[in-house]
Amino acid sequence: MRDMTAPLPGSRRRRTFGVYIGRFEPPHTAHLEVMLEALRSVQKLIIVIGSARAARTPKNPFTAEERQDIIAAMLQEAGIARPRILFVHVRDYFYNETLWLSEVQRGVQAHTRGSSDVALIGHIKDESSYYLRSFPAWEFIPTHVVSDLSATTVRRAYFEDRLGDVADMVPPAVNAFLNTFHRAAEYADLRAEYDYLREYRESWKDAPFPPVFLTADGVVTRSGHVLLVRRDGLPGRNRLAMPGGFVGQQETLLECAMRKVRGESGLNTAIPLDTQLRSQKVFDYPDRSLRGRTVTHAFHFDLGIGQLPVLSEPHALWMPLGDAMERPELFFEDHHAIIEHFLMRG
């Protein structure tokens, strides 16, 4: 059997560091093939794990730490020495690409320690590969691995209990983890959400055009706190969210946001909202919601300083801004990113 870790014959010189970026939700056999190929061209491979510190969803079912562990296990299983593998965890920044690029660069530089002998590993296959052009300082080494396999296909089989199909698509170490996770309470929650979302999308599949849903949300701040609600239904059960929802047929966006703020939090109607409107913005990242194409218009209401108003709804709470910004994994969809946007504006 050919040694998949030996340098490629007649190839370019071996780089000190390689960088391979992905979400790996979960890592599959094509990911492993790319990594093994890369390790024939570089001394050490820095694996950048995206969508870190996000809430578990059917699209992002595993934590960055879990993905790191199973990647390390599958590479060790393939005969790769652990010191040759380095990891970086990077959050999603749906509305600030510069922050994402900066976090990738900082994470990589923490390992390279000033070395410029860095190559970026990847395959430009569609619009999702745009990031490969975003690091001009790193030589681009295209992978020769060609595969139709995707993590989406693996997840679909996993949440539809086709575990035999899953075993054919992932390395043994990954399959062992998935079988164990399949018995965990987290899997049951994710499976319930997967089934809910599938039925939700099925309900409008016969529409003449794919629907675009319109929602309005309120970011309400007061004395260093932000008003949040804890979702009690699917999708996103027990996740923190801004109060908000679908726009009614006979109301403006602002009216919808104010109605949802009061209705979901129990904020006293004597507290004005419209006069405390500080800013507003449309958030339309195409994949921001697993329910389907959803565009939201968010309004920032700044209630100034003073005692925190009483909230009569049991699922509503005031959270210190520092705590909210430090815990993106607690939030539903892109709500953390939306709140972060308004807070960064000052």
Residue ranges with predicted function:
Residues M258, G266-Q307:
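Active-site segment of metal-dependent pyrophosphate-handling enzymes
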Residues M1-S203:
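Nucleotidyltransferase catalytic core that binds NTPs
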Residues L240-E251:
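Short histidine-centered catalytic/ligand-binding loop motif
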Residues R198-M242, T269, L303:
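N-terminal strand-loop-strand
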Residues P243, A257, V261:
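Hydrophobic alpha-helical positions that pack around
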Residues G122-D126, R231-D232, H297:
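Short, well-ordered beta-to-alpha junction loops that form the rim of enzyme active sites
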Residues E139-I141, Q280-K281, T296-H300, Q307-R345:
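NUDIX/MutT-family hydrolases
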